[in-house]
C-alpha cells in the first residue's frame, strides 16, 4: 500500500526528491516505485508493475526527473537528445517541461537551433549510496561512486588548465 504522503509527493509538480520516502518504505510496491523515482529514468517506467491508477502522474514525474538528470551535466542539450530520453513527441511539450523545471534549472531555450543551454543547475537527482538493495534497477546511474569519479575528473581538468 502506497502511503498518502508518497502519493502527494508524486503528484506535486515541484517534488524531485524521494529518497527519504524510499529509505523508510516497507511495502514492496511502494519501494519499487520510489526506487525508480529516486534512481531511474523515463526508460525504467515499465519496470513499475503496480500503481496503474497513477501511471500518468508517474510517467509525467519520470519525464521531469529524466530532464533534470540531463541538465545536471552538459552545458548544452540538444532537443533531439532530450526528447528521445523522455519520449517527448514535439518541441512545444519539451519547452513546457523545461519551464516546469525553472526552480531547479536556469536555462536558455534556442527554439530555432533546437538547443537548451543550461546556465546553472540548482537541483540534482537523488544519489544511491548502497543504503539498501535495489529491487528493480540493476544499477543506479547516479551513485556515490559515479559522483566521486565525476568530481575527480573535474578536479584533474581544473588542475590541467591551471598548469
Swiss-Prot record:
Q: List the disulfide bonds.
A: none
GO CC annotation terms, alphabetical: COP9 signalosome; cytoplasm
Query: Is the tRNA processing keyword given for this protein?
Result: no
Q: Its Gene Ontology biological processes? A: cellular response to pheromone; conjugation with cellular fusion; protein deneddylation
* Chief subcellular location: cytoplasm
Keywords linked to the UniProt accession: Cytoplasm, Nucleus, Signalosome
Under InterPro entries, the record lists: Csn9_fungi
Name its cellular compartments. Answer: Cytoplasm; Nucleus
Can you give the residue ranges of the PCI domain? 5-120
In the UniProt record, does the keyword Mitochondrion occur?
A: no
Role noted for this protein: Component of the COP9 signalosome (CSN) complex that acts as a regulator of the ubiquitin (Ubl) conjugation pathway by mediating the deneddylation of the cullin subunit of SCF-type E3 ubiquitin-protein ligase complexes. The complex is involved in the regulation of the mating pheromone response.
Quaternary data: Component of a COP9 signalosome-like (CSN) complex.
Provide the protein name.
COP9 signalosome complex subunit 9
What is the phylogenetic placement of the source species in the record?
Eukaryota, Fungi, Dikarya, Ascomycota, Saccharomycotina
Gene responsible for this protein? CSN9
Amino acid at each position: 500500500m502506497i502511503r498518502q504522503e508518497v502519493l502527494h509527493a508524486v503528484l506535486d509538480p515541484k517534488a524531485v526528491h524521494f529518497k527519504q520516502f524510499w529509505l523508510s518504505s516497507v511495502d514492496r510496491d511502494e519501494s519499487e516505485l520510489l526506487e525508480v523515482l529516486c534512481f531511474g529514468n523515463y526508460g525504467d517506467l515499465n519496470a513499475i508493475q503496480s500503481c496503474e491508477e497513477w501511471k500518468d502522474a508517474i510517467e509525467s514525474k519520470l519525464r521531469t526527473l529524466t530532464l533534470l538528470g540531463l541538465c545536471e551535466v552538459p552545458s548544452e542539450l540538444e532537443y533531439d537528445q532530450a526528447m528521445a530520453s523522455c519520449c517527448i513527441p514535439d518541441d512545444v511539450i519539451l519547452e513546457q517541461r523545461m519551464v516546469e523545471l525553472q526552480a531547479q534549472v536556469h536555462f536558455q531555450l534556442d527554439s530555432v537551433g533546437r538547443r537548451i543551454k543550461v546556465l546553472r543547475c540548482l537541483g540534482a537527482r537523488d544519489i544511491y549510496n548502497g543504503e539498501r538493495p535495489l529491487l528493480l534497477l540493476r544499477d543506479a546511474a547516479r551513485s556515490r561512486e559515479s559522483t566521486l569519479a565525476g568530481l575527480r575528473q573535474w578536479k584533474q581538468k581544473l588542475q590541467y588548465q591551471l598548469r
